[in-house]
């Protein structure tokens, strides 16, 4: 799926967060937003996901203008993962069961074995299924959320500081897996490790 922004701006409480931003991502393209702190990286991802609407300009998903009437449809085509990684309460297993019971996800039948197969790629063990989500470290939450992106297999990934706080090996694994994915991916990150892989382009202010 393609993403295109035309002169997008966003202002809140009189403060201009994003101004006249235009760019496009072709299907399967991957780009990193590496702007300084406080310049609207996370806000941009939320605008594309439809959490809020631009003050000015237009956002297109597959050449369709994102608006109130189609935002729910397009959200089902996107996975949004952030550094907070808010997971349902209970054990990780119960949390996964709840997520895959949602109407948008219930078509994914064999999610348990798929998740289990992916755990080793992000250096987690199957013992994590028995942990309570409230006991997980930030890094464990981030890696689980990234696994969810892979299992949900939606055509667009929006990744907000997905490598923040991870060690070098885990960062490298995540970067490699994102680079190898077929999805259209937009990443918000300060991490310079993304520049070490030529699969990614960079969006400037």
Residue ranges and their predicted role:
Residues 49:
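Helix-to-loop junction immediately C-terminal to a conserved catalytic motif
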Residues 57-65, 74:
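Conserved ABC transporter NBD signature motif
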Residues 84, 90-107:
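Q-loop/switch helix immediately C-terminal to the Walker
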Residues 110-128:
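Conserved ABC ATPase "signature" region
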Residues 132-136, 140:
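Conserved ABC ATPase signature
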Residues 146-147:
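Hydrophobic anchor residue at the start of the ABC signature
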Residues 150-151:
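ABC ATPase C-loop
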Residues 157-161:
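Catalytic Walker B motif of ABC-type/P-loop ATPase nucleotide-binding domains
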């Amino acid at each position: 799926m393609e993403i295109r922004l035309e002169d997008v701006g966003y202002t809140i409480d009189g403060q201009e967060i994003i101004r006249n931003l235009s760019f496009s991502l072709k299907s399967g393209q991957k780009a990193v937003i590496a702007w300084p702190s406080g310049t609207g990286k996370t806000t941009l991802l939320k605008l594309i996901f439809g959490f809020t609407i631009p003050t000015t300009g237009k956002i297109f998903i597959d050449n369709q203008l994102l608006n109130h009437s189609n935002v729910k449809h397009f959200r089902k085509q996107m996975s949004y993962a952030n550094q907070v990684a808010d997971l349902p309460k209970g054990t990780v297993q119960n949390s996964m069961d709840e997520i895959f019971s949602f109407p948008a996800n219930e078509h994914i039948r064999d999610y348990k074995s798929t998740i289990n197969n992916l755990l080793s790629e992000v250096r987690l063990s199957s013992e994590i299924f028995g942990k309570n989500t409230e006991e997980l470290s930030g890094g464990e939450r981030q890696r689980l959320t990234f696994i969810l992106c892979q299992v949900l297999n939606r055509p667009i990934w929006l990744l907000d500081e997905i490598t923040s706080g991870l060690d070098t090996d885990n960062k490298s694994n995540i970067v490699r897996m994102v680079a190898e994915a077929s999805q259209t991916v937009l990443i918000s990150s300060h991490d310079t490790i993304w520049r070490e892989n030529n699969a990614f382009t960079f969006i400037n202010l």
